[in-house]
C-alpha cells in the first residue's frame, strides 16, 4: 500500500500543548508531508508561519471538544481562524440537538461555520459513539446538502473513537458527495490501514510519525 502520509492530519489537541510542541508537530508534518496539522486555535498564527514554505495545510478546531458553543460563537471563532491564515476547520456539532432530532440547530451551526470559513475546508465532527446509525445517516445527508467537505467520526475525547463499521456506514451514506475523516484511537499503521480501506479519506492522529515508521517496515499490510 502506498504511503499513508497524504491522508494524515497530524494532530496535537491536548490541554497542555505548548508552542514548542506545536513547532515540533509542524516540523514533523513538513518532513513527512502529511496532509495537515490540526492544532488548538491559539496556535494558528504560529503554525501558519512555521509551515509557510511547505504544502502542509494548517487546521484548527471550533466548538471543540463538546460542541457547546452557540452558532454565533462558532461562526466568530471560524472567522478569527480564517483571518489568521487557517486552511481547514474541524467543527463539533451540538450533539444534544442531534440526539433530540433538532437537526435545524445542527444545520444552523454548520451553515454558520461554512459561511465564515469562506471556502476553507470544513470537517464536521458528529461523535459517532453517541448516535444510532439512522441518525448518523441523517447527519451525512444534512452535511452533504449544506456543503461541508467532510464528516468526521469523533473528537478523540469521547468514550470511544473511530470504528471501522462507522467509516463504512458514513462512506456508503455519503455516496461520493462528502468525504469521511476517521479520528480517535488511530494509534498504529494497522488501525490506520483499516480506516483507509473502509473508506476514510483522512485520518486524524497524534501518532502520525509512528504510523509512517510502521508503514515503512511493513508497507504490504
From Swiss-Prot:
Reactions accelerated catalytically: 2-deoxy-D-ribose 5-phosphate = D-glyceraldehyde 3-phosphate + acetaldehyde
EC number, UniProt record: 4.1.2.4
Pathway it works in: Carbohydrate degradation; 2-deoxy-D-ribose 1-phosphate degradation; D-glyceraldehyde 3-phosphate and acetaldehyde from 2-deoxy-alpha-D-ribose 1-phosphate: step 2/2
SMART domains per UniProt: DeoC (SM01133)
Subcellular location: Cytoplasm
Keywords from the named record: Cytoplasm, Lyase, Schiff base
Family matches, as InterPro entries: Aldolase_TIM, DeoC, DeoC/FbaB/LacD_aldolase, DeoC_typeI
GO cellular component annotations of the record: cytoplasm
Molecular function GO terms recorded: deoxyribose-phosphate aldolase activity
Residues forming the catalytic site: 90, 152, 181
BP-aspect Gene Ontology terms: 2-deoxyribose 1-phosphate catabolic process; carbohydrate catabolic process; deoxyribonucleotide catabolic process
One protein family per Pfam: DeoC
Function per UniProt: Catalyzes a reversible aldol reaction between acetaldehyde and D-glyceraldehyde 3-phosphate to generate 2-deoxy-D-ribose 5-phosphate.
Family: Belongs to the DeoC/FbaB aldolase family. DeoC type 1 subfamily.
Identification of the protein by name: Deoxyribose-phosphate aldolase
Organism: Syntrophotalea carbinolica (strain DSM 2380 / NBRC 103641 / GraBd1)
Amino acid at each position: 500500500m502506498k504511503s499513508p502520509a497524504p491522508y494524515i492530519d497530524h494532530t496535537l489537541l491536548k490541554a497542555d500543548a505548548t508552542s514548542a510542541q506545536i513547532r515540533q508537530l509542524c516540523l514533523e508534518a513538513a518532513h513527512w508531508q502529511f496532509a495537515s496539522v490540526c492544532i488548538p486555535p491559539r496556535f494558528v498564527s504560529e503554525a501558519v508561519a512555521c509551515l509557510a514554505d511547505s504544502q502542509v495545510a494548517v487546521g484548527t478546531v471550533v466548538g471543540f471538544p463538546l460542541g457547546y458553543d452557540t452558532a454565533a460563537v462558532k461562526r466568530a471563532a471560524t472567522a478569527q481562524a480564517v483571518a489568521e491564515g487557517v486552511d481547514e476547520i474541524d467543527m463539533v456539532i451540538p450533539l444534544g440537538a442531534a440526539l433530540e432530532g433538532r437537526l435545524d440547530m445542527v444545520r444552523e451551526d454548520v451553515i454558520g461555520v461554512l459561511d465564515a470559513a469562506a471556502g476553507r475546508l470544513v470537517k464536521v465532527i458528529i461523535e459517532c459513539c453517541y448516535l444510532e446509525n439512522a441518525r448518523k445517516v441523517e447527519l451525512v445527508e444534512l452535511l452533504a446538502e449544506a456543503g461541508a467537505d467532510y464528516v468526521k467520526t469523533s473528537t478523540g475525547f469521547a468514550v470511544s473513537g473511530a470504528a471501522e463499521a462507522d467509516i463504512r456506514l458514513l462512506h456508503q451514506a455519503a455516496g461520493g458527495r462528502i468525504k469521511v475523516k476517521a479520528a480517535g484511537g488511530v494509534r498504529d499503521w494497522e488501525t490506520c490501514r483499516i480506516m483507509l480501506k473502509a473508506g476514510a479519506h483522512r485520518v486524524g492522529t497524534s501518532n502520525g510519525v509512528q504510523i509512517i515508521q510502521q508503514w515503512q517496515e511493513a508497507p504490504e499490510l
